[in-house]
Amino acid sequence: MDRGKPGSKMHVLSDANGLPLRVALSAANIHDSLALKSMLSHFHMGHESHAADSKPARLHADKAYDIPHLRRWLWGKRIGIRISRKGIDSSERLGRRRWVIERTMSWLTGYRRLNHRYERKPGNYLAFLGLASALCCYKRFLKLTM
């Protein structure tokens, strides 16, 4: 919240098909990279025999996440990264993968309660974000079973 105005950012971690795996919410004046560790730390990254089923194999992100300590942290967790480097790579090369998360964000903001933040309390907005994510997964499940 900035001067009493309800401004927030949605952080969405999705799979390769665009299904939202984890959603989070932060203030609008917080840098995007600060939310990544908390989102990934909730995945179980324990024993090697279970690691293939419980952690992302590769992470695609834009230039906002190009921070050396974040790259080292992901490398330490053995998560493959494809982060566009500041000043070197253009964002155009991420287009092959970026449309997946852009489509997911479009699905989520298609819900009226998420397109414009009507809720004053962040917890209420996060609840609607979780509900919209569950509905996206449910709709995808229906398409696969019909």
Protein language model regions, located:
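Polybasic low-complexity intrinsically disordered regions
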Residues: M1-K86, R93, A132, M146
